[in-house]
Curated annotation (Swiss-Prot):
This is Ubiquitin carboxyl-terminal hydrolase 17-like protein 1. InterPro entries: Papain-like_cys_pep_sf, Peptidase_C19, Peptidase_C19_UCH, USP_CS, USP_dom. GO terms for cellular component: cytosol; endoplasmic reticulum; nucleus. Residues 382-411 are annotated as: Disordered. The gene is USP17L1. Residues 80-375 form the USP domain. SUPFAM superfamilies: Cysteine proteinases (SSF54001). Its main location: nucleus. It holds the Pfam family UCH. Keywords: Apoptosis, Endoplasmic reticulum, Hydrolase, Nucleus, Protease, Thiol protease, Ubl conjugation pathway. Deubiquitinating enzyme that removes conjugated ubiquitin from specific proteins to regulate different cellular processes that may include cell proliferation, progression through the cell cycle, apoptosis, cell migration, and the cellular response to viral infection. Residues 382-392, 398-411 have a biased composition (Basic and acidic residues). Its EC number is 3.4.19.12. The active site is at 89 (nucleophile), 334 (proton acceptor).
């Protein structure tokens, strides 16, 4: 992750405003000059409602508002962990947060896009649909993200998680557009991605000489917050919308009185997104040094104080995902995330490891990126989770997975996900997997005779080694990026030390080998049964 980011973005470009910097979705912006005085300001409650409609005329509406589909097939349990392919923790952490973004996930599970996609090559929406579908329907497994997700971005080294996140969001937004290159910027603001993540800023400049008002509107997909002097997200938001005085060298050149006069500039949210991506600016632009300080962020956030219209009720958002960076520089360290996969349950997603955690642990992190969703949207999309079918248990039949894979292939040629199915591996050390093995053992009254090879001296005398580890006790510790969990990944490379039993474990063996068939370079798991 360096200064040579591949994300084609830049700073928000307000005519007379430099306080806000963020990833900009496109170069389009609109400016509206007003000639009225404050007591006759055209920005009344009636006029404000229509301003964004003026910015996005009905020439072509790609995703009608309030028409996002609610999938009835979303499982209620947490999905799969993601295998670290070498310095890809930033990718895994971002994908997990997007996977548990309810409006996006429900749209992907509905397969509405793939059924109508006309792109000859794979698009990001089709690729994300395949990934989200497999991740949510593979609880207890570890899957390998498709290389197409980071194509053109990953260069074999650590990258910035925010840059990759916006790279992915922008690629999905472009996939929503028609195939031809010339697309009106108003049309871009009606895409599915903009309907989920997009909003509109209003920068209002008031000339203190003639009292004229100039309004500039600009779309956004994320919000960058300066935390240098802020102890909380609320303080950072208050600083962001605090009026700025323009005088002296920064005096405003008024287009109404045609004079260079002092003015005040106020930034507010004209429309707020369904899903807010708040980026805490922890890294310096030049050296990449990290600002390691605790910044408080709430579980519920009221965005009404930062809106242009103040005469409405609370606009409550709820936290559902957090991206965290562990380290001292943007050039190294480790990324992981926290997600709320159910209405109240939080999980820590650290590459292949998926663990239950509490909200106290979530709110005590040095967060880098925060994901909030409007409470009404969360409740609306959560209803589809309760109506969805129950997730399959650990070790469910492979035929069901293959049937789903074939179903995806028939929908669109981009949804080719054999590598995901081939790389679904069992997390052998999980308690539920061990219980499943014991259940298989109890189905047969006759216990097989096990031919057990040499057992490590540190194991109990009655221990049974199902998979002999090829790593010795004296092995060196790995860098956090290199140990995505030795016990979570499996391999088919057979060693001279391996000794497998026969009999009632034959079916379990066969299924394990099929699931691990092409994972040639991963580590062998060790399962000890008392």
């Amino acid at each position: 992750m360096g200064d040579d980011s591949l994300y084609l973005g830049g700073e928000w470009q307000f005519n007379h405003f430099s306080k806000l910097t963020s990833s900009r979705p496109d170069a389009a912006f609109a400016e509206i000059q007003r000639t009225s005085l404050p007591e006759k300001s055209p920005l009344s409650s009636e006029t404000r409602v229509d301003l964004c409609d003026d910015l996005a005329p009905v020439a072509r509406q790609l995703a009608p508002r309030e028409k996002l589909p609610l999938s009835s097939r979303r499982p209620a349990a947490v999905g799969a962990g993601l295998q670290n392919m070498g310095n890809t923790c930033y990718e895994n952490a971002s994908l997990q947060c997007l996977t548990y973004t309810l409006p996006l996930a429900n749209y992907m599970l509905s397969r509405e896009h793939s059924q109508t996609c006309q792109r000859p090559k794979c698009c990001m929406l089709c690729t994300m649909q395949a990934h989200i579908t497999w991740a949510l329907h593979s609880p207890g497994h570890v899957i390998q993200p498709s290389q197409a997700l980071a194509a053109g971005f990953h260069r074999g080294k650590q990258e910035d998680v925010h840059e990759f996140l916006m790279f992915t969001v922008d690629a999905m937004k472009k996939a929503c557009l028609p195939g031809h290159k010339q697309v009106d910027h108003h049309c871009k603001d009606t895409t599915l991605i903009h309907q989920i993540f997009g909003g509109c800023w209003r920068s209002q400049i008031k000339c203190l000489h003639c009292h004229g008002i100039s309004d500039t509107f600009d779309p956004y997909l994320d919000i960058a917050l300066d935390i240098q002097a802020a102890q909380s997200v609320k303080q950072a938001l208050e600083q962001l919308v605090k009026p700025e005085e323009l005088n002296g060298e920064n005096a405003y050149h008024c287009g109404l009185c045609l004079q260079r006069a002092p003015a005040s500039n106020t930034l507010t949210l004209h429309t707020s997104a369904k899903v807010l991506i708040l980026v805490l600016k922890r890294f310096s632009d030049v050296a990449g040094n990290k600002l390691a300080k605790n910044v408080q962020y709430p579980e519920c956030l009221d965005m009404q104080p930062y809106m242009s219209q103040q005469n409405t009720g609370p606009l409550v958002y709820v936290l559902y995902a957090v991206l965290v960076h562990a380290g001292w520089s943007c050039h190294d360290g480790h990324y992981f995330s926290y997600v709320k996969a159910q209405e109240v349950q939080w999980y820590k997603m650290d590459d292949a490891e998926v663990t239950v955690c509490s909200i106290i642990s979530v709110l005590s992190q040095q967060a880098y990126v925060l994901f909030y969703i409007q409470k009404s949207e969360w409740e609306r999309h959560s209803e589809s989770v309760s109506r969805g079918r129950e997730p399959r248990a650990l070790g469910a039949e492979d035929t069901d997975r293959r049937a789903k894979q074939g179903e995806l292939k028939r929908d669109h040629p981009c949804l080719q996900a054999p590598e995901l199915d081939e790389h679904l591996v069992e997390r052998a050390t999980q308690e539920s997997t061990l219980d499943h093995w014991k259940f298989l053992q109890e189905q047969n009254k006759t216990k097989p005779e096990f031919n057990v090879g040499k057992v490590e001296g540190t194991l109990p005398p009655n221990a049974l080694v199902i998979h002999q580890s090829k790593y010795k006790c004296g092995m060196k510790n790995h860098h956090p990026e290199q140990q995505s969990s030795l016990l979570n990944l499996s391999s088919t490379t057979r060693t001279d030390q391996e000794s497998m039993n026969t009999g009632t474990l034959a079916s379990l063996q066969g299924r394990t080998r099929r699931a691990k068939g092409k994972n040639k370079h991963s580590k062998r798991a060790l399962l000890v049964c008392q």
